[in-house]
A protein has these predicted regions:
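Short aromatic-enriched loop/helix-cap "lid" or pocket-rim segments at secondary-structure transitions
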Residues: 22-24, 82, 120-126, 161-164, ...
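Alpha-helical scaffold elements lining the catalytic groove of polysaccharide deacetylases
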Residues: 82, 133, 139-144, 148, ...
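Low-complexity, Gly/Ser/Thr/Pro-rich intrinsically disordered linker/tail segments
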Residues: 261-274
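Active-site beta->alpha N-cap acidic-glycine motif
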Residues: 7-8, 15-146, 157, 196, ...
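Structural detector of well-ordered beta-strand residues that form the stable sheet scaffold
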Residues: 109-111, 150, 232-235
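Charged, glycine/proline-rich intrinsically disordered loops and linkers
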Residues: 74, 80-91, 165-177, 218-228
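N-terminal carbohydrate-binding accessory modules
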Residues: 1-6, 10
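His/Asp/Glu-enriched short active-site or ligand-binding loop at hydrolase and phosphoryl-transfer sites
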Residues: 50-52, 175-177, 197-205, 210-262
């Protein structure tokens, strides 16, 4: 375990949040602004994996005034510029990240949904039916060096899946993943799918859908099964910076739009952690 006194805020965005041209309704605008603000204020962007390695005692880096980046759900908007219906051209998170040359260690972890059926339904019902939730971009993005791919469950237990899950599991809530059968369905199945496509141990991080972290998973299932699945840590959305005392199976993240929604609020958030 590191003897350094460290805390690292993990910031989370959703590339599908494109509700207009302004910061509060467009995570691409927010992402670009936040990168500029963080760099101007002397914060260093580091890979999310570094945060996990520090917490697990696998590394002892100087993480003073560092932050890490993540995004959830895994749309092509994470890595490719698109023409968004009604909103015009949107630069991807990767495009914006690569343009920030003042951050040599810049990196973004994209937490993706594994199930092809779930992604197809979400693309049709929640986006614009433009095949923005395919998996064709995963391997090239991972190989490029600026993107990590993380596990965001099999199907997010999303309500687009009209049929109940295992054991008549209701949809739209991840707190109900509360036994071995449901956990295997949502997490183990996703880990196996990602490993088959990206390589064993290529996706060691998990993010809880909706930020819901059931005690069963945090205190029981992940400690028993995580390592065998190649998983090292899991992230919530409860706010707060990751540090030496953080639970590795429920590491905190801040979410754009939930914990801050303007440049001034973002700057205040960083100031509170400096």
């Amino acid at each position: 375990m590191s003897t350094r006194d460290w805390q690292v805020p993990v910031l989370t965005y959703h590339a599908s949040t494109v509700g207009g041209p302004d910061y509060a309704g467009n995570d691409h605008v927010a992402f670009a602004s936040d990168l500029e603000t963080a760099t101007r204020l002397g914060w260093r962007i580091v890979p999310l994996q570094w945060v996990v390695e520090q917490r697990l005692g696998l590394a002892d880096r100087d993480l003073t005034r560092c932050l890490a980046l993540s995004c959830d759900d895994g749309t092509v908007l994470d890595v490719h510029d698109v023409d968004y219906p009604g909103q015009g051209r949107q630069p991807s998170f990767l495009t914006l990240l690569e343009a920030n040359h003042g951050q040599p260690d810049r990196h973004l972890t994209c937490f993706v949904i594994a199930s092809p059926e779930a992604r197809a339904r979400m693309d049709r019902d929640c986006l614009h039916g433009l095949d923005w939730m395919g998996e064709h971009w995963w391997a090239p993005a991972l190989a490029g060096g600026r993107i990590g791919i993380g596990n965001h469950s099999w199907d997010h237990n999303h309500p687009v899946m009209a049929e109940p899950g295992p054991g008549n599991m209701p949809r739209g809530d991840f707190h109900v993943v509360d036994d071995d059968v449901r956990a295997d369905y949502e997490i183990r199945q996703a880990a196996d799918y990602l490993a088959a496509r990206l390589g064993q141990d290529a996706c060691p991080l998990f993010a809880y859908p909706y930020g819901h972290a059931p005690d069963f998973l945090v205190r029981d299932w992940f400690p028993r099964h995580g390592a065998r699945l190649g998983l090292q840590a899991a992230f919530g959305t409860q706010g707060g910076a990751a540090g030496p005392g953080s639970d590795p199976w429920h590491l905190p993240r801040y979410v754009c739009g939930l914990h801050w929604s303007s440049p001034a609020q973002f700057e205040a958030l960083l100031a509170s952690l400096a």
